[in-house]
UniProtKB/Swiss-Prot annotation:
Manner of cofactor binding, per the entry note: Binds 2 Zn(2+) ions per subunit.
Source domain of life: Bacteria
Enzyme class: hydrolase
GO molecular function (one): metal ion binding
UniProt-listed InterPro entries: Clx_II_MBL, Glyoxalase_II_hydrolase, HAGH_C, Hydroxyacylglutathione_Hdrlase, Metallo-B-lactamas, RibonucZ/Hydroxyglut_hydro
Name of the protein in question: Hydroxyacylglutathione hydrolase
Lineage: Bacteria, Pseudomonadati, Pseudomonadota, Alphaproteobacteria, Hyphomicrobiales
Length: 255
């Protein structure tokens, strides 16, 4: 199994390093902040070979030029990001495979938060790097497309095994938990998860990774097919889940 380190960048971004112990190949998933990535590389002694970009937003790529200059890492980014990601060596689209030593990730195009967003899915290891598409107890803001586009992207995750580890690009767990409890107040799994989130934050940690099973049980944005969530937005049970999701996302925007 790969070695993975997570760490805080900027104010709420989550930096991630993944290393293949068989070959020493190591990737950063986005570079929100050069200093944090370089510090953790120094602490681990790992040598960075790759940077895998999930999307073009500044808070995910700001540190890319410095980290590439310091490490010589190869930068892979979504083809649809165009020139918005600096220092790109290779681009990827839906269905491409990215190799990190002996590890192989399938590239999913997961638009909704932004049009160029991709997820890196390591099927053998059951690990998904979801960027700003799926968060612990939440999902990304819809910025460039109708909300149903993000719902379609999120629906792809629902087909993955429950034990899949989900690494997201931000730690918004407390605000996400508050909204989730407002939308799904009678969910006992959610209540326990929200209490855990409070304890973890008090300890200076974060609930990343999460698992798909945990999110299916507690994340309102993955539960748009559930009668309780339809009722929460004033819709009848059995309503179109894309419409329920849209109403939930619009509610969260105002929350």
């Amino acid at each position: 199994m790969p070695e993975i380190r997570t760490f805080l960048c900027r104010s709420d971004n989550i930096g991630v390093l993944i290393r293949d112990p068989a070959t020493g190949a190591c990737a950063a998933i986005d570079v929100p902040e050069a200093g944090a990535v370089l510090r953790v590389l120094g602490e681990t002694g790992w040598s960075l070979t790759d940077i895998l970009v999930t999307h073009r937003h500044f808070d995910h790529v700001e540190g890319t030029p410095e980290v590439k200059a310091r490490t010589g890492a190869r930068v892979t980014a979504p083809a649809k990001a165009g020139d918005a990601v600096p220092e790109v060596d290779a681009t990827v689209r839906e269905g491409d495979a990215v190799r990190l030593g002996s590890l192989v990730a399938a590239v999913w195009e997961t638009p909704g938060h932004c049009a160029d967003h991709v997820t890196y899915w390591f099927e053998r290891e059951r690990i998904a790097f979801a960027g700003d598409t799926l968060f612990t107890l939440g999902c990304g803001r819809v910025m460039e497309s109708p909300p149903e586009v993000l719902w379609r992207s999120l629906s792809r995750f629902l087909a993955l095994p429950d034990e899949t580890a989900i690494y997201s690009g931000h730690d918004y767990v407390l605000s996400n938990a508050r909204f989730a409890l407002a939308a799904d107040p009678d969910n006992p799994n959610l209540k326990a998860r929200a209490e855990l989130a409070e304890r973890v934050k008090r300890d200076g940690r974060f609930l990343i990774p999460t698992t798909l099973g945990e999110e299916k049980a507690t994340n309102p944005f993955l539960r748009a097919t559930e009668p309780a969530l339809a009722r929460a937005v004033g819709m009848a049970p059995g309503s179109d889940p894309a419409a329920v999701f849209t109403a939930l996302r619009e509610w969260k925007n105002r929350f």
